[in-house]
């Protein structure tokens, strides 16, 4: 059975990620583990760690429900605010075949601006596939 680590936050409900998951499920039995980094919820120059964790928890709960409704075997966790550290933490003691990094498009994505895909590829031994959402989540856009 193939195993996938999905790392995402604002894009966990994107059609692009849903399609990538469907494609992997179509190749045979698969399990997914979702990590939602507790990235800061920006309100001007400050942010609140509790608010960041609460937003990440809400996104994780929605994603778990969505994955399960599509027939996926899935688990998940809230991770460190840095997506690279969150990924490395999630990989400790867990074997996966591929990491799916779900991001916003260039110009909007802080993760791409921080070069997260390259940093991940340099720090882990698992293939990393970047899934770029064409839009921001509706729930996030309203926040």
Question: Which residues does each PLM region occupy?
Answer:
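Structural beta-alpha unit
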Residues: 70-98, 143
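Glycine-rich, Arg-bearing micro-motifs that act as flexible, cationic patches
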Residues: 102-119
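Short, well-ordered secondary-structure micro-motifs
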Residues: 16-17, 43-48, 88-89, 111-112, ...
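Small/aliphatic-rich secondary-structure junction motif
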Residues: 1-47, 126, 130-133
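Short, surface-exposed alpha-helical segments at coil->helix boundaries
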Residues: 53-61, 114-117
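Acidic, proline/glycine-rich short linear motifs
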Residues: 34-58, 140-143
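Glycine-rich, aromatic-bearing surface loops/beta-hairpins
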Residues: 122-123, 127-131, 139-143
């Amino acid at each position: 059975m193939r195993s996938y680590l999905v790392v995402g936050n604002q894009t966990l409900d994107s059609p692009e990620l849903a399609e990538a998951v469907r494609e992997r499920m179509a190749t045979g039995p698969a399990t997914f583990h979702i990590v939602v980094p507790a990235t800061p919820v920006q309100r001007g120059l400050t942010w609140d760690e509790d608010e960041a964790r609460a937003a990440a928890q809400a996104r994780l709960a929605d994603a778990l429900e969505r994955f399960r409704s599509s027939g996926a075997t899935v688990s998940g966790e809230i991770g460190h605010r840095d997506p690279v550290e969150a990924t490395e933490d999630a990989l400790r003691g867990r074997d996966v075949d591929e990491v799916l990094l779900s991001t916003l498009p260039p110009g909007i994505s802080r993760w791409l601006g921080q070069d997260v895909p390259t940093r991940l590829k340099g720090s882990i031994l698992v293939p990393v596939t970047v899934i770029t959402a064409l839009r921001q989540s509706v729930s996030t856009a309203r926040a």
